[in-house]
């Protein structure tokens, strides 16, 4: 296992920051088509930073999906997803993370059918050069839990999962059971803390000062033979600036205890 972080500043300053933090890689997350096109256009400069710093791009992802509407996969949007996937391959990433939005105009069956077509298109384009992983984040993505995985993943044996325990915890699901049952399909893991008080979520502090049972998380990862990367996700409005930088170092020290 290696430890890195999400870093959407992929200029020389962003790469230098990650290197100075003592981390091994960056993950780039694109939250819309504009951000995806920006990365596609910057692929040569990003590759130059990889060579300069020795910090690689472990994963590229697309969040907040708009890939289907009116019962069909949008071909123009699909091209951007495929170009982003090609960029991830060009940069040497290990995984490409995506999801698919739910189309309210069609049936659940048709949504599942379109999801299978969509992920199969990505898998075919990858052609074994990179792992395709579905995110368990709910942000304009409906393929996020065992209910959907049980339908889609058996149809696509090469489709993996990008797992974040905090997402399951925040929807009151059993993240340890999900990891135990589906651990062999996990290709990439987000390290993000989350804290609840009573029935309300409070914040997403650094992992290690949160509610997630990270010891059990790692016990399950080891039991399922996980050898993928661990990506710190800063995700708190409170932990910003100097406090945010200190939080990254806190998480790094905490998580490294489990990396045997």
Per-range role (PLM):
Residues 1-4, 9-22, 77, 92, ...:
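Histidine-acidic metal/acid-base catalytic patches
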Residues 1-2, 58-68:
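N-terminal small/glycine-rich loop or linker at the start of catalytic domains
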Residues 9-11, 30-32, 63-66, 100-104, ...:
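Active-site-proximal loop/turn and secondary-structure-junction residues that shape catalytic pockets
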Residues 27, 59-61, 97, 133, ...:
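Conserved beta-strand positions in the central sheet of alpha/beta enzyme cores
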Residues 27-50, 100-107:
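Glycine-rich, proline-tolerant flexible connector loops at the mouths of alpha/beta enzymes
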Residues 32, 65-74, 208:
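The substrate-binding groove and active-site-proximal loops of carbohydrate-active enzymes
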Residues 42-53, 118-125, 178, 216-220:
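Catalytic-core regions built around general acid/base machinery
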Residues 49-52, 69-160:
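Active-site acidic/histidine proton-transfer and metal-coordination neighborhood
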């Amino acid at each position: 296992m290696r430890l890195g972080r999400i870093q959407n500043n992929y200029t020389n300053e962003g790469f230098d920051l990650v290197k100075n933090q003592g981390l091994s890689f960056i993950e780039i997350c694109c939250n819309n088509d504009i951000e995806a096109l920006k990365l596609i256009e910057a692929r040569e400069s990003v590759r130059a930073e990889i060579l300069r710093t020795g910090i690689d791009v472990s994963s590229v992802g697309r969040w907040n999906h708009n890939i289907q509407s009116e019962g069909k996969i949008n071909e123009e949007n699909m091209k951007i997803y495929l170009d982003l996937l090609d960029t991830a391959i060009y940069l040497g990433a290990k995984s490409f993370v995506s999801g698919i939005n739910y189309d309210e105009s069609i049936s659940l069956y048709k949504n599942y059918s379109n999801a299978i077509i969509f992920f199969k298109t990505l898998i075919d384009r990858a052609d074994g050069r990179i792992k395709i992983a579905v995110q368990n984040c709910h942000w304009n993505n409906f393929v996020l839990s065992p209910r959907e995985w049980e339908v889609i993943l058996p149809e696509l044996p090469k489709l993996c999962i990008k797992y974040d325990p905090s997402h399951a915890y925040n929807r009151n699901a059993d993240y340890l059971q999900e990891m135990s049952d589906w651990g062999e399909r996990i290709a990439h893991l987000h390290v993000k803390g989350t804290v609840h008080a009573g029935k309300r979520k409070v914040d997403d502090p650094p992992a290690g000062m949160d509610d997630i049972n990270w010891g059990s998380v790692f016990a399950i990862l080891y039991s399922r033979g996980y050898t993928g990367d661990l990506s710190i996700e800063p995700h708190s409005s409170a932990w910003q600036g100097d406090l945010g930088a200190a939080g990254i170092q806190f998480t790094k020290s905490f998580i490294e205890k489990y990396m045997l």
